[in-house]
């Protein structure tokens, strides 16, 4: 499991006083209002930044970090990812997982046959869809429904599914 989770990306400056515009990579952008600090991933080097203010503008989050007081300073942070440590991550309901924790798990069918590796999760609104790549690099799209996904074991690196009839046809 990753120690830090991506919650957003700094995409541009906002104004001239050091604010930054960010996109959310979390289900609940309002969580930014509860954060007191975050980590900025500067190409693999994490730096802690205290948050002085958060507001929302259209689909974006406007963040003011302590010590970033000019457009020039803000410009240096553009493009970097915003991360939180697990202690500050949202508490998930039982049998729910962070996408970053399940990417890379092996996916097996009801006969314990390897289908492939989970490469991505598409969030459709109604239910997630797992993108599984098999040994021939073919993608299988599997609905992440309780009736399909029977077990997720991060410890074993495994997801067990019962495929709907006709899914592989």
Curated annotation (Swiss-Prot):
The gene is rimM. Residues 93-167 form the PRC barrel domain. Binds ribosomal protein uS19. It comes from the Bacteria. The keyword Heme does not apply. GO terms for cellular component: cytoplasm; ribosome. One of its GO terms (molecular function) is ribosome binding. It is found in: Cytoplasm. Its main location: cytoplasm. One of its GO terms (biological process) is ribosomal small subunit biogenesis. This is Ribosome maturation factor RimM.
């Amino acid at each position: 499991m990753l120690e830090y989770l991506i919650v957003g990306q700094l995409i541009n400056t906002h104004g001239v006083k050091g604010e930054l515009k960010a996109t959310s990579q979390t289900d609940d952008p309002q969580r930014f209002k509860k954060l007191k600090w975050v980590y900025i991933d500067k190409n693999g080097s994490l730096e802690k930044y205290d948050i002085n203010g958060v507001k929302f503008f259209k689909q974006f989050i406007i963040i003011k970090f302590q010590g970033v007081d000019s457009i020039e300073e803000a410009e240096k942070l553009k493009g970097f990812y915003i991360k939180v440590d697990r202690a500050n991550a949202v508490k998930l309901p039982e049998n729910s997982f962070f996408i970053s924790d399940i990417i890379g798990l092996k996916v097996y069918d009801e006969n314990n046959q390897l289908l492939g590796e989970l490469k991505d999760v598409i969030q459709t609104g109604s239910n997630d869809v797992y993108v599984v790549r098999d040994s021939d690099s073919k993608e299988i799209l599997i609905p992440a429904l309780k009736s399909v996904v029977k077990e997720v074991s991060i410890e074993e690196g495994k997801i067990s599914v019962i495929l709907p009839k006709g899914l592989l046809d």
